[in-house]
Design a protein with these regions (language model features):
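Surface-exposed intrinsically disordered loops and tails
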Residues: 24-36
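Exported/periplasmic ABC-transporter solute-binding proteins
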Residues: 1-4, 12-21, 41-48, 54-200
Length: 200
C-alpha cells in the first residue's frame, strides 16, 4: 500500500477496480474515484482456485466442502480462513453464504481462526494448528499441502488475477513489455506449473 510500482497484479478484481479510472463513476467498484492505471493495459491474466487444504495425515478426515459445512455446523472442526479485508477471506465468505453458514455464529462457537493474509492461513494448516484451511491452489502447491476439494464458481465465483501497468510507472514501456511477456505461452507454462490457470 502506497508503494511505487510499475505493474500491479491483484488476487481479485475488487482491488484493481478501486484503482481503475474507467470505473470512477461506479462508486461501488471505485469508491474513491481513483485513476491509477495506464489506459488500455488492464487484462485478466490468471485464474486461481479456492481450495480446502488439510494438514499432513488429515486427522479429521475432511473430504470436501460439503463435509466441512456439516462439521462446522456440529462444531467438530477448527477452520482457518482469511480476514474479511483480504481476497481469500472474501471468497470464503461467499462459500459460507453458499452453505448458509453464519460466520459470526461460527466464530463465536470457536470453530474459526483467522489470518491477515493467505500465507498466515497456509501456515496454520502446514503447522497442524487447525484441521483445515481455505487457501488458493497455488499456496497449497507451494506448501506441499493436500487439497481435498476445490470451490466451484457457483460457490464463490472465479478467482481472477487482473494485471495492469500503473499510470505513475517510472518505466512504462518496460512495464508494458513485461506485462506482454506474462501473457506468453512461455510465462503461462510457468504459472500453470504452480497451480494457476491461464486467462489470456
Amino acid at each position: 500500500q502506497d508503494a511505487d510500482c510499475d505493474v500491479f497484479i491483484s488476487a481479485a478484481p475488487k482491488q484493481m477496480n478501486a484503482l481503475d479510472g474507467s470505473l470512477k463513476d461506479d462508486t461501488d467498484k471505485n469508491p474513491d474515484g481513483l485513476d491509477e492505471l495506464q489506459g488500455g493495459t488492464r487484462i485478466d491474466l490468471l485464474e486461481n482456485k479456492v481450495t480446502l487444504a488439510v494438514p499432513e495425515g488429515n486427522p479429521k478426515g475432511i473430504k470436501s466442502f460439503d463435509n466441512l459445512a456439516e462439521k462446522l455446523k456440529n462444531g467438530d472442526v477448527l477452520l482457518a480462513i482469511g480476514n474479511s479485508d483480504v481476497p481469500v477471506g472474501q471468497y470464503t465468505q461467499k462459500i459460507f453464504s453458499y452453505y448458509k453458514l453464519d460466520e459470526k455464529a461460527l466464530a463465536d462457537a470457536g470453530v474459526l481462526t483467522y489470518g491477515s493474509n493467505v500465507k498466515e492461513v497456509t501456515t496454520q494448516v502446514s503447522e497442524g494448528t487447525v484441521d483445515c484451511g481455505v487457501i488458493y491452489a497455488t499456496d497449497a502447491f507451494s506448501a506441499g499441502l493436500t487439497v481435498v476439494d476445490e470451490a466451484t464458481a457457483e460457490m464463490c465465483g472465479q478467482v481472477i488475477y487482473p494485471a495492469a501497468v500503473m499510470k505513475n510507472s517510472a518505466n512504462p514501456d518496460a512495464a508494458k513489455a513485461f506485462l506482454d511477456f506474462l501473457s506468453t505461452d512461455e510465462a503461462m507454462a510457468c504459472f500453470e506449473a504452480v497451480g494457476f490457470s491461464p486467462m489470456v
